[in-house]
Structure formats: C-alpha cells, structure tokens
Amino acid sequence: MSTYTTRSIGAPNTLDYKVYIEKDGKPVSAFHDIPLYANAEKTILNMIVEVPRWTNAKMEISKDLALNPIIQDTKKGKLRFVRNCFPHHGYIHNYGAFPQTWEDPNHVHPETKAKGDNDPLDVCEIGETVGYTGQVKQVKVLGVMALLDEGETDWKIIAIDVKDPLASKVNDIEDVERHLPGLLRATNEWFRIYKIPDGKPENQFAFSGECKNKKYADEVIRECEEAWETLIAGKASDDKGISLENTTLENTPTFTASASIPEGQNLAPAPIDQSIDKWFYISGASV
C-alpha cells in the first residue's frame, strides 16, 4: 500500500511556508496525483487535510505553484487567519479538499444558480481526531452544504474518517444529527458568520441552508470529478492558469516523470500576532 508523507519548506506562519505531499518518497501534486477514491467500490475517498480543527491559519492547496503544495492564503501580501467567532475557535472541523476534483468556474450549477469557485471540492471531516496539514485521510461521504460565497457556489462536503469510532454508525446525513446533535447547525452557523470579523457580510446558503444527503453529495462529487478530468486533459474552456503538472498521470499533457522540490525543513512556527486569539461576538449568531 502506498504511503503518503509530507515535506515542509519554510516556517509555519510565514510567506515561505509550503507543505508538499510525497508518495513513497516521490513528490506528487496534492491537486492532481492523489486518487479521489481509495477503494475500487468508490465508497471510501481520499481527503487532503489543509486546516486542522481548532487552528486559524487559512491553509489551502496552491493552484499556481508546481505540484500544488499547501500554502497559507494571503490578501494584499498579508497572511490570512480565520478569526475566532464565539463560541468557536478557528476552524470548526478538519478542513480540506478532495483531490482530482474541480469546482468549474465556467459552469453555472442549475440549482444554486452560481458558478464554481475554481477550487478543489471542500471537505469538512467531522471525526474526533485532529488532523495535520498535508495528511491524506480516508473518509466516507455523508452529505453536502451549498455555501454561496461572494456569488460563487462553494460546496462543503460533510465526511467522516473511516477510522473514527462513529464511522460505522453514520452513513447518511440524518445519522449525523442522531449521533452528533447540533453539529450541522453549528457548521451552518460557522460558515455563515466566519468572515464577519473581517468586515464582510455573512455568507448565504442555497437550499435555505439545508444539508443535502449522501446521494446528492455523491452527485456533486461526480460532477466535480468530471470537471477535473476535463481540466487535467487540457480541454477546459478556461483553466484559470492552474498548474497542471503531475508525476503519475502519464497520459496527460503536463505529466513529468521526475520533479524536484527543495529539501525538507523542520522549522519552528513564526510567532503570530496575539490579536488572532481574540474572540469575536457576532450579533445574531446562535449557540
């Protein structure tokens, strides 16, 4: 069985920080090389953890850099941190993405009436174990929320680590409310309010905030997988400048047999401003 490991460059909380993923010691693209499905039956999926639960740094798979390492997002040259919206601290779940998926910005979804956000499909992993940036988790899908983020469709797949003690008991979205009461309501609230401390309006949801079931989520995943297949084949009407370099997909135009990345470093995190620890109290937020 293949083993995925991470290689870190630079210090966390700096502009230089990058987390590459390697498979059996060989660099791979976090976006393109890791299979979406972890088993032949397509019931278990590979999720890449970008942001561990309860942390603030807005880490994401880079669309621009070769092999798509995980980096910290920036705005106007400054590192982005998610604020603490009471009673939450940082991200409410292990947050990440499904590889080999793409929310196509050239396509308007018929039900949300909004185009894709040009990113891999987002995943909220709701198990009890806190992950780490660059971790490849095996998860099963339970449902999906449709966030409308600044006019774009931004799907949020709800999933659980297959190794979680509850994994055998939760198989669809209604099981989440049964075994984890309040989690879906809190997830909806968090995504609705988390940008307010930065001066932005609250986010909106399609379907009146309803979390759709596993069947609907599987269809969203299939659509985003097909969009990625068009992208990696070089056939997208507009690839938005995404780096498509990969080291495993030999039949694609951007395959490279060998790719070099810098030597790994194990540097201590740079200090961050104490204001990141502040709690923000949002009027109208439910607890």
Swiss-Prot record:
Family named by the database record: Belongs to the PPase family.
Predominant location: cytoplasm
Binding site for Mg(2+) 1: D117, D122, D154
Organism encoding this protein: Yarrowia lipolytica (strain CLIB 122 / E 150) (Yeast)
Name the record gives this protein: Inorganic pyrophosphatase
Keywords tagged on the record: Cytoplasm, Hydrolase, Magnesium, Metal-binding
Top EC category: hydrolase
TM regions (residue ranges): none
Catalytic reaction equation(s): diphosphate + H2O = 2 phosphate + H(+)
Binding locations of diphosphate: R80
GO BP field: phosphate-containing compound metabolic process
InterPro entries in UniProt: Pyrophosphatase (IPR008162), Pyrophosphatase_sf (IPR036649)
PANTHER family per record: INORGANIC PYROPHOSPHATASE
